[in-house]
Amino acid sequence: MNLQDHFLIAMPHLEDENFQRSVVYICENNEQGSMGLVLTQATDLSIAELCAKMNFMMADEREYSDKLVLLGGPVNLEHGFILHKKTAQEFQHSYKVTDQIYLTTSADIINTFGTAQSPEKYLVTLGCARWEPNQLENEIANNDWLVVPADENILFDVNSSERWFAANQLLGIEHVNFSYQQQMEHS
């Protein structure tokens, strides 16, 4: 099963602080391993503040997003990753995840923020998550993750603090079911 364009939903027993109660969007999954972005851990830095820190043109006529930058995972924390809807403009370092979703790592996309050339929908992360070949598949087999096809609404429109619950609901799972299960396991 190719996991690209799928959500990984952390099971409640997953205690790694990088992935606890997380949803990860898988951008790439092949024989060389997997790469994804954690969608549930907001930083205290807004996208507008990130643009200012990076000395991009902060023109008055632009409207910058007040959305928060996400902590995309424990790897490459010094690198930004922008997941976005397809645009008419091509960017220097973009990877096609699906026909409509791209991952861009070049700064030229940031210069479009607040303009008509900006992607209609996007999110910004610092860092990413990576797995060695077969590592992710083994974690799934060990019941660390649930897997569901990605949902663009959850990806771009749901608040990061609500994505874990929303992704679980794609599978018909309510968070109260997990709470009951955990209580039974600890009794």
Curated annotation (Swiss-Prot):
One of its GO terms (cellular component) is cytosol. Belongs to the UPF0301 (AlgH) family. Pfam families: DUF179. This is UPF0301 protein HSM_1900. InterPro entries: AlgH-like (IPR003774). It comes from the Bacteria. Disulfide bonds: none annotated. It comes from Histophilus somni (strain 2336).
